[in-house]
Amino acid sequence: MSSLLNFYRKVLNVPLSLLVKSRAIPTDPVKELNLNLEQPIIYVLPYTSQTDLLILQKNCLSLNLPDPLQNNELNGQSLPRYVFLDEGRRFFKSKGAKSETESIFYRYLDLHRNNESLDVQLIPASVLWGRSPGKESEPHLRLMSSFQRIISMIWFGRDNFVRFSQALSLKYMVAEHGADEGIAQKLARVAKIHFAKQRYSAMGPRLPDRQAMFNKIIQSPAIKAAIEEEAKTKKISIEKARQEAEKIVNEIAADVSHESLRIADRVLSWLWNKLYQGINVQNGDRVRKLALEGHEIVYVPCHRSHMDYLLLSYLLYHQGLVPPHIAAGINLNFFPAGPIFRSWGAFFIRRTFKGNRLYSTIFREYLAELFYRGYSVEYFIEGGRSRTGRLLEPKTGMMSMTLQALQRGLTRPISIVPVYIGYEHVLEVDTYAKELRGAEKEKENAGLVLRVIKKLKNLGQCYVNFAEPIQVNNYLNQHFPEWKESQAEDSRPKWLNEAVDSVAHQVMININKAAAINAKNLIGSVLLASRQRALAREQLIEQVDSYLQLFKNVSYSDDVIVPNDSAEEMLNHVLTLPRSGVISEKDSFGEMIRLDRESAVLMTYYRNNIQHLFVLPSLVASIILHHESVSKDLIIKTVNRIYPFLKAELFLHFEENDVRNQVEAILTEFSAQRIVKYESDVLQINRARVRALQLHAAGVREILQRYYISLSILLEHPEISRAALEKESRSIAQRLSILHGINAPEFFDKALFSTFSASLKAQGYFDSEGNCILEKAKEAEEILRSLISVEVQLTIQGAMEKVEEVENTETVVKTAEAVTEKNE
């Protein structure tokens, strides 16, 4: 039988080598699963299939894993390196696989009794042929027959995945549970349950019968009530209101097609190869673990580009997970993109629900139905794409609906997975710059898509990092324990608004904790720190090295992606990127690297992607630079006064009682790099490296100037309203940006001044009547003034005087007009 089986495998390998191209999940199992190749491995497959076994063998050999067809030689015994859990359907019906498997498990377990150094690693491995879960109306099919497998080989040969799961230590099993035959049987049962969960996590629930789903939604009590109200309000018939409801459901709902997803996989594989030199994915194991545990997963990425929609779904598919249903703006529902996106899982959402109860009720019910059926969901919490490269303030509507779904009695735990997405080049960045200069946003259409496609070329690297998940049930239990109290389905519990804001804010913090530093955003940050946007090559390399050491030795977060390349390699990479704006020039003194004028504004976008990572070191450097000699305690006191504003603006994760330790670590690192002198708790400038200190300090310069503008106005006009404060601050910032050549568009962004005024209120700078507390504001203003150049202070003071002159003139004119009217 063995010779016949070997012959069959050789024959079978011929069509497999021609028709099947499989991909391993994860791509580097030795590293990602922490496998010890010094210890024996046994692979467990879910059911008997020589085809799957040969595909597994091919993948193992390419990944430098032990060959499953070679036996493990242990203590004089020769044991197979693979087992099948179930017999299933197969060409060769030999021994009952299940009993044989239990026997092999027992023999492996028994070997551990008298060999303490032995630790066999049991690795579940499954081969997926296609990823379609089928439709709800279709019958459940168990395993494929021989003929079906041949057809699958032809049809799904390019859609084949080998999934390696976390290894189980048999040494641990024996130590905890013993090594008898009952444990071997239990091991087999646990493995079967694992494979069932794994299959579900890869394929997801069956696709809905769209019309049946529509009917269920329309028949829900909440929508029936909304239809009746619509008819009453608009004075139309119930039937007409119902037709309007059906039209809305059809406008919103996705229409997922697995065949469309397969085509998308081919198209997007071509697209990414054309666009990017590489796609770097981190922490995918976090999501796979949640999926295996049966969590309802909600992906919440930052929003940089329209590419985000496509990229995340593509990567999840290649991580062995189900692509989510994606909340897409209604602006993307144009022909032909709309129907295509809908077939890939997009459901469409209008920009505003205000004044349309029928629409908001239907959308809420549709989202709740997706959760109820077990589909993963994705939405962009910022509401739209960031034009500045910074995270925007979260829009909480979708988050509110997510928490309400939990309140309605969803049985599965919900986990929110924040996702950081970063690019070395964003396709729309030119458009963003125009919009920030005042141009109107161009409506998405087929022509715009074609123009973007023409730009497709080498765009460098792309980064996707799955941040620390937020398990909503646990989060609410910890922070809002009253959430479990029963509520009427149509009521809004008191805890909800605060909980929604809290979870949304934590999402933004976790996204920033997973930021990716790359060659372009780091080199761009250093060049923008120089007032002339140019540095000698040696100085640039030295400063990039300084940042790399800082990020590695004083980590912002364990999730941050820090490049392994040298500063030299990073610079050479950026110089090869098309339209990077980074130029190399030579003169008689050597090589200079500069940023061309037109690209300076665009480069601020990429700097802003990672500004939060270096803003605290930059603030510390700025304090030392302006004081020249300063005590550690004064540095910490100054940082503590400014940090709450930075935390609110940049979604920083350090709690205020952690800031001292972080500042001390930064000071130690600056001293180790000889950027400063650190003796007896006093910090002094090291004149030999003052340029490095200046470049570090520049990262927070414009932020401090913005804060100083607002506080100066507040001290001059303590009774000023928040709206007027924000407006006047923005006007002065615009003038300052022109006179001092500040290229960053966000410098006079009204949203940032709004965030700062809200922070002032939260930090107690206003009394209960909304008036400024002068003493506190004066202290903060003095701290900021000590960190800002005299030239900038004079410009701000001059601008304030101009504003006051204009206001006085306007007052005189209005008074004169009033007198004239009275006399007439």
From Swiss-Prot:
GO cellular component, one term: plasma membrane
Cell location: Cell inner membrane
Pfam families associated with the record: Acyltransferase, GPAT_C
One GO BP: CDP-diacylglycerol biosynthetic process
SUPFAM superfamilies (alphabetical): Glycerol-3-phosphate (1)-acyltransferase (SSF69593)
EC numbers, comma separated: 2.3.1.15
Domain of life from the UniProt record: Bacteria
InterPro entries associated with the record: GPAT/DHAPAT, GPAT/DHAPAT_C, GPAT/DHAPAT_LPLAT, GPAT_PlsB, Plipid/glycerol_acylTrfase
UniProt keyword terms in alphabetical order: Acyltransferase, Cell inner membrane, Cell membrane, Lipid biosynthesis, Lipid metabolism, Membrane, Phospholipid biosynthesis, Phospholipid metabolism, Transferase
Motif (HXXXXD motif): 302-307
Pathway assigned in UniProt: Phospholipid metabolism; CDP-diacylglycerol biosynthesis; CDP-diacylglycerol from sn-glycerol 3-phosphate: step 1/3
CDD domains from the UniProt entry: LPLAT_DHAPAT-like
Recorded GO MF terms: glycerol-3-phosphate O-acyltransferase activity
Major subcellular site: membrane
Reactions mediated catalytically: sn-glycerol 3-phosphate + an acyl-CoA = a 1-acyl-sn-glycero-3-phosphate + CoA
Broad class of enzyme this protein falls into: transferase
Bilayer topology annotation: Peripheral membrane protein
Family stated for the protein in its record: Belongs to the GPAT/DAPAT family.
Xref: HAMAP family: Glyc3P_acyltrans (MF_00393)
UniProt remark on domains: The HXXXXD motif is essential for acyltransferase activity and may constitute the binding site for the phosphate moiety of the glycerol-3-phosphate.
Protein name per its UniProtKB record: Glycerol-3-phosphate acyltransferase
Organism: Actinobacillus pleuropneumoniae serotype 3 (strain JL03)
